From Swiss-Prot:
Pfam families: PurA. Residues 294-313 have a biased composition (Low complexity). Keywords: Acetylation, Activator, DNA-binding, Nucleus, Phosphoprotein, Transcription, Transcription regulation. This is Transcriptional activator protein Pur-alpha. Belongs to the PUR DNA-binding protein family. Its main location: nucleus. Residues 9-51 have a biased composition (Gly residues). It is found in: Nucleus.
Length: 321
């Protein structure tokens, strides 16, 4: 896609038309005017909030950031599935684009913004507008990153066109096997406002990002067998507590994740096979001992037979003399 249509004034019209925005806490008339259909944007087409009907979603906080001729709204919301962040861009023509992030993804996104801010600060001056406008072909991104979390993908590209430098953020949602990905949602942040946007996001994360205290979990451990090392690490996510068992060799690493609810079954299974192997090994030892005893008996019988034969031969030779 050429850079000239990367901004949301054009891209947002095609990608973000699934309802109007609601920002009860915004301080501008234009923001309040879009507030009438806020719930529809939360659960409708577009990126889609993480589930829930309009009356089930509660807005906890809202911030507005004005950058050039665009308005950006950052809304922290909560429904039965937890807290999430909606980022909406409203262009000069009223075109809207919106992204939906879980709070954990918002934390990672904030950190990526810091990287883009640092990279942008180290760049030289932009190309002259007439030269940039003369180049119709798409230009390579100045810096790119992407995030993949569950069924959502986020693509971040620091780019430049005749209007200047901007951070383009695109979100796609995978609806499941056979359903493919939905049409992406895209916003474009002018580079001059990245710091202000990042600071507003960081404030919301500080105030609303932690919903509960981290779970108290056992410390990890490890053991070494021959040239392998096994690591046992306990963690947790929204699905519950789990143990990650990793097998590490100098040139190889593999791991499995075991949910807490089957630890007892895993332990019982290991103990069962441990006992069975003990019995098998005991039988093998008994069999080897029996074979060794039989071999010794056969060897002893052979020695006795050989001795008796030699004795008989000696007696026969004596009688002949």
């Amino acid at each position: 896609m050429a850079d000239r249509d990367s901004g949301s004034e054009q891209g947002g019209a095609a990608l973000g038309s699934g309802g109007s925005l609601g920002h009860p806490g915004s301080g501008s008339g234009s923001g309040g005017g879009g507030g009438g259909g806020g719930g529809g944007g939360g659960s409708g087409g577009g990126g889609g909030a993480p589930g829930g009907l309009q009356h089930e979603t509660q807005e906890l906080a809202s911030k507005r950031v004005d950058i050039q001729n665009k308005r950006f709204y950052l809304d922290v919301k909560q429904n039965a599935k937890g807290r999430f962040l909606k980022i909406a861009e409203v262009g000069a023509g009223g075109n809207k684009s919106r992204l939906t992030l879980s709070m954990s993804v918002a934390v990672e996104f904030r950190d990526y913004l810091g990287d883009f801010i640092e990279h942008y600060a180290q760049l030289g001056p932009s190309q002259p507008p007439d030269l940039a406008q003369a180049q119709d072909e798409p230009r390579r991104a100045l810096k790119s990153e992407f995030l993949v979390r569950e069924n959502r993908k986020y693509y971040m590209d620091l780019k430049e066109n005749q209007r200047g430098r901007f951070l383009r953020i695109r979100q796609t949602v995978n609806r499941g096997p056979g359903l493919g990905s939905t049409q992406g949602q895209t916003i474009a942040l002018p580079a001059q406002g990245l710091i202000e946007f990042r600071d507003a996001l960081a404030k919301l994360i500080d105030d609303y990002g932690v919903e509960e205290e981290p779970a108290e979990l056992p410390e990890g451990t490890s053991l070494t067998v021959d040239n392998k090392r096994f690591f046992f690490d306990v963690g947790s996510n929204k699905y519950g507590v789990f143990m990650r068992v990793s097998e590490v060799k100098p040139t190889y690493r593999n791991s499995i994740t075991v949910p807490y609810k089957v630890w007892a079954k895993f332990g019982h299974t290991f103990c069962k096979y441990s006992e069975e192997m003990k019995k098998i090994q005991e039988k093998q030892r008994e069999k080897r001992a029996a074979c060794e005893q039989l071999h010794q008996q056969q060897q002893q019988q052979q020695e006795e037979t050989t001795a008796a034969t030699l004795l008989l031969q000696g007696e026969e030779e004596g009688e002949e003399d």
